[in-house]
């Protein structure tokens, strides 16, 4: 067996780390993907380049707790805080998916201090495409 590395987590001494540059982007878009298992909040600029992101799992929830509205709220607050460091003040919101964290994430973006412009649902709707999974019998 090969020997384990001593410090696998962080950069070594003398090694330069890339410092995250502060961008000044006043207007962006918040993409909220809310599935049955998780909620992912991504804040981008108008070209679609990612400024900040957070998810229920990234915030610290595991398993079925990731799909709760409270986890979505914390994820949205976390992403909004990171985006405000880059100067984002106003966002358009694009919501995708059937999950339980949709409305909560939008409300917490507003509560975090971001001004919400338009809200649009971009959930893909099949024109009778793939066969859905079979019904659960409990």
UniProtKB/Swiss-Prot annotation:
Part of the 30S ribosomal subunit. Interacts with proteins S7 and S18. Binds to IF-3. The lineage of its organism: Bacteria, Bacillati, Actinomycetota, Actinomycetes, Mycobacteriales. This is Small ribosomal subunit protein uS11. Located on the platform of the 30S subunit, it bridges several disparate RNA helices of the 16S rRNA. Forms part of the Shine-Dalgarno cleft in the 70S ribosome. The keyword Ribonucleoprotein applies. GO terms for cellular component: ribonucleoprotein complex; ribosome. Keywords: Ribonucleoprotein, Ribosomal protein, RNA-binding, rRNA-binding. Residues 1-12 have a biased composition (Low complexity).
């Amino acid at each position: 067996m090969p020997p384990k590395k001593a410090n696998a987590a962080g950069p070594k001494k003398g090694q330069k780390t890339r410092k995250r540059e502060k961008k000044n982007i006043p207007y962006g878009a918040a993409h909220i993907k809310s599935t049955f298992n998780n909620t992912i909040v991504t804040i981008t600029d108008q070209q679609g380049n990612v400024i900040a992101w957070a998810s229920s799992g990234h915030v610290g929830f595991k398993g079925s707790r990731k799909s709760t509205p409270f986890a979505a709220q914390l994820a949205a607050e976390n992403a909004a805080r990171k985006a405000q460091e880059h100067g984002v003040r106003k966002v358009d919101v694009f919501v995708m998916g059937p999950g339980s964290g949709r409305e909560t994430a939008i409300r917490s973006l507003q509560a975090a201090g971001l001004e919400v412009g338009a809200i649009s649902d971009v959930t893909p709707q099949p024109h009778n495409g793939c066969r859905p999974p079979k019904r659960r019998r409990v």
